[in-house]
């Protein structure tokens, strides 16, 4: 007998394989995992038949296990499918313990609007260009919701802008250095989703000790905070703070501390002669805050 139900839904131009693998990595123990395959070709056509298929599977599964709590993970369009399903089934809301969106264009896909600017019905573009922010905000009042977005630059994951993924009432996490498909393979995304599904309360990180450690590095010089866009994620703290780097063996190596609201709290750099000192400081932080970090160890 499973302890809970975890539905996972793939998105546009995809099948269920990768999100099923992700679900296996992040699911709570003894969870029953359901990852319907909607078919690659069908994801290019209309969203309503896809919603109907997933709704049928969910209805049957929830009826079979009427007392089990329910969680959902949806990647991109998969998250939109579940926003529609849950909006139509408020009787399921009391059973929902977590709804995780991975790069879902809740406010509408800008590429879809470009492909179908008049809303004439050009394939799936019409359906993905619609804003579902109002529906998502109503759901967020009834259940815990997490929106994880990738960021290759400060605008988004090369497919979905950051501003399209956020809405009132959600927990908003941006994972730097991850593009749209990479949300399904990132160990840091896995860790954030696993932490949320387990309903753990993140402990806040006082940034001052971290900043003091970085400032104490030999040769550290104040840098340009705007440069953190496109930097590599090194450490992700459970409260959303992230330590990012731009590393170079021949010029300057930059380090940034960014908070959960995407504000850069520290920016600095060292020259090649002090590069080793910087990486030793990062290793020290990794050890000191090991119990507050999400994601893989090197």
What does each model-identified segment do?
Residues 1-5:
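A short, charged/proline- and glycine-enriched loop
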Residues 6-12, 16-17, 21, 26-27, ...:
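Serine-dependent carboxylesterase/thioesterase catalytic core
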Residues 140-298:
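C-terminal catalytic-base region of ester-bond hydrolases, centering on the histidine
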């Amino acid at each position: 007998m499973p302890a809970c139900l975890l539905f996972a839904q793939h998105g546009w131009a995809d099948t269920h394989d990768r999100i099923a693998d992700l679900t296996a990595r992040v699911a709570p123990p003894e969870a029953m995992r359901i990852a319907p395959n909607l078919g690659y070709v069908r994801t290019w056509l209309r969203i309503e038949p896809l919603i109907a298929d997933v709704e049928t599977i969910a209805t049957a599964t929830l009826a079979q296990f009427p007392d089990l709590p329910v969680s959902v993970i949806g990647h991109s369009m998969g998250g939109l499918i579940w926003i529609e399903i849950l909006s139509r089934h408020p009787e399921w809301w009391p059973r929902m313990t977590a709804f995780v969106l991975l790069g879902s264009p809740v406010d509408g896909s800008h590429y879809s609007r470009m492909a179908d600017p008049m809303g004439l019905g050009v394939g799936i573009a019409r359906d993905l260009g619609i804003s579902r922010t109002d529906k998502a905000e109503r759901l967020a009042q009834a259940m815990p919701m997490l929106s994880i977005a990738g960021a290759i630059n400060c605008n988004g994951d090369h497919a979905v802008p950051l501003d399209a993924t956020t809405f009132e009432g959600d927990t908003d996490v941006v994972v730097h250095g991850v593009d749209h498909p990479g949300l399904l393979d990132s160990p840091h995304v896995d860790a954030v989703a696993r932490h949320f599904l387990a309903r753990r309360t993140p402990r806040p990180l006082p940034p001052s000790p971290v900043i003091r450690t970085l400032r104490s590095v030999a040769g550290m010089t104040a840098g340009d905070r705007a440069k953190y866009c496109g930097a590599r994620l090194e450490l992700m703290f459970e409260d959303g703070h992230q330590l990012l780097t731009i590393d170079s063996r021949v010029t300057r190596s930059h380090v940034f501390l960014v908070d959960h609201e995407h504000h850069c709290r520290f920016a600095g750099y060292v020259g090649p002669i002090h590069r080793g000192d910087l990486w030793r400081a990062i290793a020290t932080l990794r050890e000191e805050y090991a119990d507050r970090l999400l994601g893989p160890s090197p």
